[in-house]
Amino acid sequence: MIDWGYRAQRLAYRAASALGLVQSQTRRPPASKGTAGLRQQVIHFINKPMPGGLPKRTSRALLDVEDKRIVPLIRDPQKAGDDAEAVFYFPGCGSERLFGQVGLATQAMLYEVGSICVLPPGYLCCGYPQTAAGEQEAGQKIITDNRVLFHRVANTLNYLDIRTVVVSCGTCMDQLMQYQFDKIFPGCRLLDIHEYLLEKGVQLDGLSGTRYMYHDPCHTPMKTYQ
């Protein structure tokens, strides 16, 4: 459904471009004292094309770990020995189903730094969309079901002594802060993948003189390091 919606939006963008309706992204918006008219709203919606070329398969499908009866453990045996740090990675809907390349990249980085990446069994939603939409009961049920499942994972893998829960989505971060993970994995903390990589000393080499701009999203995942 999302794929077809994106296709329709990109088609509308191309049609608007041909008609000269698309505005420059650097153009100063006109002054307004009230609600934008329908024409302005439509132009704003199609003024920039939605992304295309989304992954056809999720990272779980690519790694053949979709079975919700198993708890996947991903590690590099050459780097992750018996004393390697284990982290619990919660991908969420966005990083797993919608933009699967984000989830795959996160797992690849954990693999690269020599950590053991523990994934939840099966596809899971954090419950934020339901709660934000006013479906409090549905959202609370998801939270409760997930916490019960995570307790089972913690008990099964207690020998790994998981002390870090990693996320790659700021919205999931906000929701998971309500999960009381310190009572699931005793003594654990909740970190964004970038904060975790910062702790591991991961850097980009050969970028002298290159400047970057970082956009901090509304649901910022940076809760520990500023």
Placement of each model-derived feature along the sequence:
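Iron-sulfur cluster-binding electron-transfer modules in prokaryotic oxidoreductases
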Residues: M1-Q226
